[in-house]
Regions:
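A charged N-terminal "starter" segment
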Residues: 1-138
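Acidic (Asp/Glu)-rich catalytic clusters
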Residues: 66-76, 95-97, 115-117, 136-145, ...
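Glycine- and other small-residue-rich loops at beta-strand/loop junctions that grip anionic moieties
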Residues: 80-81, 103, 125, 150-153, ...
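Structural preference for beta-strand elements that scaffold enzyme active sites
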Residues: 78-80, 102, 120-122, 147-149, ...
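Active-site loop/helix belt of alpha/beta enzymes
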Residues: 181-247
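Generic structural signal for well-ordered alpha-helices
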Residues: 58, 62-69, 92, 111, ...
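Internal, well-ordered alpha/beta segment that forms a basic, Gly-enriched binding/recognition surface
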Residues: 150-172, 176, 183-184, 194
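Active-site beta-loop-alpha junctions enriched in small/polar residues
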Residues: 86-88, 108, 126-128, 151-157, ...
């Protein structure tokens, strides 16, 4: 996989984006370069911007970035923080610059925003809609250094991805994670056998690459903290167990 998770030149292009009058919160009467916001001298305490307004304190941001980097190093884990809350390529760059492996996102439009510099995205959702598949493959074909790891939990989904990749003529295989799910919940393979069936289909499909297994432990949480901790601690073992069956 590509070793550079971020492209500073693509991020710099955002500085040239023109903000138009009517942009929420900004007191501008003429178009303004986004990169010029910092020299306008605006002060929220003087009500120069409309409310509500969110402020980021750089010292706190640097502290949080450093703390999370050291936490991951101490525990020997890699992190792809979820970007759907901030939707800020500048913050994505700061996270990647502090050791993040990539950025997690939930929708294809979010992936399109992240491509302003982000080189590696985990799309933590089923990629099944034809328009979404077409958009992701177009991004990959346009930029050979861009990586997008997607999910699948069904044979039908694998077939759809494989057919689309073949039609697109990608130079590299599309990495796919098998999603592990929970009975009665929103997505994912319900059993180990189902997960292994999907995994074998991915591994045997031209144009696809079996990248591993993943799941969302948040759906395990109840109001019983002790039981929740046990369940969440055990959940990664399911993914590891599925992976060992594939060796």
């Amino acid at each position: 996989m590509h070793t550079l998770p971020h492209d500073g030149l693509a991020l710099a292009s955002l500085e040239e984006h023109l903000l138009q009058p009517g942009t929420k919160g900004l007191p501008i009467l003429e178009p303004l370069r986004q990169g010029a916001i910092g020299v306008q001298g605006w002060n929220v305490l003087n009500a120069d911007t409309s409310f509500p307004v969110a402020l980021l304190k750089m010292s706190s941001l640097r502290h949080n970035l450093d703390w999370m980097r050291r936490f991951c190093e101490r525990h020997g884990v890699t992190l792809a923080p979820h970007g759907k809350t901030t939707m800020s390529p500048q913050l994505f760059a700061a996270q990647l610059g502090n050791g993040a492996w990539g950025i997690t996102l939930a929708t294809v439009p979010q992936v399109q925003v992240a491509q302003r510099g982000v080189r590696r995205v985990l799309l933590a959702n089923q990629l099944v809609a034809p328009a979404d598949i077409k958009a992701v493959l177009a991004l990959l074909k346009r930029d050979p250094h861009f990586e997008c790891i997607v999910l699948s939990d069904s044979l039908a989904g694998v077939v759809r991805l494989a057919e689309a990749v073949a039609a697109a003529g990608l130079a590299s295989p599309l990495p796919v994670l098998v999603e592990l799910g929970l009975s009665g919940k929103r997505a994912g393979c319900r059993t180990l056998d189902a997960a292994l069936t999907v995994a074998r289909a991915i591994a045997g499909a031209p144009g696809l690459l079996l990248a591993g297994f993943e799941g969302y432990e948040g759906l395990l949480v109840t109001d019983d903290r002790t039981a929740d901790l046990r369940a969440v601690d055990a959940f990664p073992g399911a993914a590891g167990g599925a992976g060992r069956h594939c060796r």
